[in-house]
Amino acid sequence: MPNIKSAIKRVDVAERNRQRNIAYKSMIKTFTKKFMTRLGEYAQSPSEAVLTEVQALLNQTFSRIDKAIKAGVIHTNTGARKKSRLDAALRTALAKAQAKAG
């Protein structure tokens, strides 16, 4: 436990930032899981309603990732990689749905 006042403040700031980082990362994971779940449902039975919901979830997930980047919680390249992988998953599911339909 630090004795110097500035060191005590640094500990408080570090804890506050750690809690904020946990919240942002958890939010990204939650929205990613929601997106992937709905995407799996779309892959099983493609429909316009589910596709619209999947695209809305993708936009929300991208927004959360961008907010985490802006807050400095994740690195820019990490955010870009996550977004790219989500987009690739959507494109793969759309291609499979078209192959199934056609």
UniProtKB/Swiss-Prot annotation:
Similarity-based family: Belongs to the bacterial ribosomal protein bS20 family.
GO CC terms of this entry: cytosol; small ribosomal subunit
Record key words, sorted: Ribonucleoprotein, Ribosomal protein, RNA-binding, rRNA-binding
Disulfide bonds: none
InterPro entries per the UniProt record, alphabetical: Ribosomal_bS20, Ribosomal_bS20_sf
PANTHER family hit by this protein: 30S RIBOSOMAL PROTEIN S20 (PTHR33398), SMALL RIBOSOMAL SUBUNIT PROTEIN BS20C (PTHR33398:SF1)
Domain of life (superkingdom): Bacteria
Biological process per Gene Ontology, one example term: translation
Name of the protein described by the UniProt record: Small ribosomal subunit protein bS20
Keyword Nucleus included in the entry's annotation: no
Record-linked SUPFAM superfamilies: Ribosomal protein S20
UniProt GO molecular function: small ribosomal subunit rRNA binding; structural constituent of ribosome
Pfam families: Ribosomal_S20p
Biological role stated in the UniProt entry: Binds directly to 16S ribosomal RNA.
Species this chain originates from: Gloeobacter violaceus (strain ATCC 29082 / PCC 7421)
Gene giving rise to this polypeptide: rpsT
